[in-house]
Protein backbone atom coordinates (compact mmCIF):
# COMPACT_ATOMS: atom_id res chain seq x y z
CA UNK A 1 0.00 0.00 0.00
CA UNK A 2 1.32 3.41 -0.95
CA UNK A 3 0.94 5.96 1.87
CA UNK A 4 0.80 9.64 0.88
CA UNK A 5 0.50 12.84 2.85
CA UNK A 6 -1.61 15.59 1.29
CA UNK A 7 -2.91 18.91 2.56
CA UNK A 8 -6.29 20.49 1.85
CA UNK A 9 -6.39 21.54 -1.79
CA UNK A 10 -3.64 19.14 -2.86
CA UNK A 11 -4.28 16.43 -5.44
CA UNK A 12 -2.88 13.03 -6.28
CA UNK A 13 -3.12 11.32 -9.65
CA UNK A 14 -3.99 7.69 -10.33
CA UNK A 15 -2.83 6.94 -13.84
CA UNK A 16 -3.48 9.68 -16.38
CA UNK A 17 -7.23 10.02 -15.92
CA UNK A 18 -8.12 9.88 -12.21
CA UNK A 19 -7.39 12.65 -9.73
CA UNK A 20 -8.18 12.67 -6.01
CA UNK A 21 -8.23 16.03 -4.22
CA UNK A 22 -8.36 16.62 -0.46
CA UNK A 23 -11.23 19.08 0.00
CA UNK A 24 -11.28 19.32 3.77
CA UNK A 25 -10.46 17.75 7.11
CA UNK A 26 -12.81 17.94 10.09
CA UNK A 27 -12.02 15.86 13.16
CA UNK A 28 -11.43 12.29 12.03
CA UNK A 29 -13.15 12.76 8.66
CA UNK A 30 -11.44 13.64 5.40
CA UNK A 31 -13.51 15.02 2.55
CA UNK A 32 -12.13 14.10 -0.87
CA UNK A 33 -13.13 14.76 -4.44
CA UNK A 34 -12.58 12.19 -7.17
CA UNK A 35 -12.43 13.22 -10.81
CA UNK A 36 -12.62 10.18 -13.09
CA UNK A 37 -14.00 9.32 -16.53
CA UNK A 38 -17.60 8.08 -16.55
CA UNK A 39 -16.49 4.58 -17.55
CA UNK A 40 -14.56 4.18 -14.27
CA UNK A 41 -16.79 3.30 -11.33
CA UNK A 42 -15.97 5.05 -8.06
CA UNK A 43 -17.60 3.79 -4.85
CA UNK A 44 -17.05 3.87 -1.12
CA UNK A 45 -15.73 0.46 -0.04
CA UNK A 46 -18.89 -0.56 1.82
CA UNK A 47 -21.03 0.24 -1.24
CA UNK A 48 -18.63 -1.66 -3.52
CA UNK A 49 -18.80 -4.72 -1.24
CA UNK A 50 -22.62 -4.59 -1.26
CA UNK A 51 -22.64 -4.42 -5.08
CA UNK A 52 -20.29 -7.42 -5.29
CA UNK A 53 -22.43 -9.38 -2.81
CA UNK A 54 -25.61 -8.63 -4.79
CA UNK A 55 -23.91 -9.68 -8.04
CA UNK A 56 -22.90 -12.99 -6.45
CA UNK A 57 -26.45 -13.63 -5.25
CA UNK A 58 -27.86 -12.70 -8.66
CA UNK A 59 -25.45 -15.09 -10.38
CA UNK A 60 -26.39 -17.91 -8.00
CA UNK A 61 -30.09 -17.24 -8.60
CA UNK A 62 -29.55 -17.45 -12.36
CA UNK A 63 -27.83 -20.82 -11.91
CA UNK A 64 -30.72 -22.06 -9.77
CA UNK A 65 -33.24 -20.96 -12.38
CA UNK A 66 -31.27 -22.80 -15.05
CA UNK A 67 -31.03 -25.91 -12.87
CA UNK A 68 -27.25 -25.92 -12.99
CA UNK A 69 -26.46 -24.85 -9.44
CA UNK A 70 -24.17 -27.10 -7.48
CA UNK A 71 -22.41 -26.02 -4.30
CA UNK A 72 -18.75 -25.47 -4.99
CA UNK A 73 -16.09 -26.30 -2.43
CA UNK A 74 -12.93 -28.30 -2.40
CA UNK A 75 -13.68 -31.52 -0.48
CA UNK A 76 -10.10 -31.82 0.73
CA UNK A 77 -10.00 -28.26 2.10
CA UNK A 78 -13.42 -28.64 3.68
CA UNK A 79 -12.60 -31.82 5.59
CA UNK A 80 -9.07 -30.80 6.61
CA UNK A 81 -10.16 -27.82 8.71
Swiss-Prot record:
One of its GO terms (cellular component) is cytosol. One of its GO terms (molecular function) is mRNA 5'-UTR binding. Pfam families: CsrA. Coiled coil: none annotated. It is found in: Cytoplasm. SUPFAM superfamilies: CsrA-like. Keywords: Activator, Cytoplasm, Repressor, RNA-binding, Translation regulation. A key translational regulator that binds mRNA to regulate translation initiation and/or mRNA stability. Mediates global changes in gene expression, shifting from rapid growth to stress survival by linking envelope stress, the stringent response and the catabolite repression systems. Usually binds in the 5'-UTR; binding at or near the Shine-Dalgarno sequence prevents ribosome-binding, repressing translation, binding elsewhere in the 5'-UTR can activate translation and/or stabilize the mRNA. Its function is antagonized by small RNA(s). NCBIfam families: csrA, PRK01712.1. HAMAP family: CsrA. Homodimer; the beta-strands of each monomer intercalate to form a hydrophobic core, while the alpha-helices form wings that extend away from the core. Belongs to the CsrA/RsmA family. This is Translational regulator CsrA. The gene is csrA.
Amino acid sequence: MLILTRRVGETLMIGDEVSVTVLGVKGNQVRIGVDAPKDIAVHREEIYQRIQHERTIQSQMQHLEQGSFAPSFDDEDYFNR
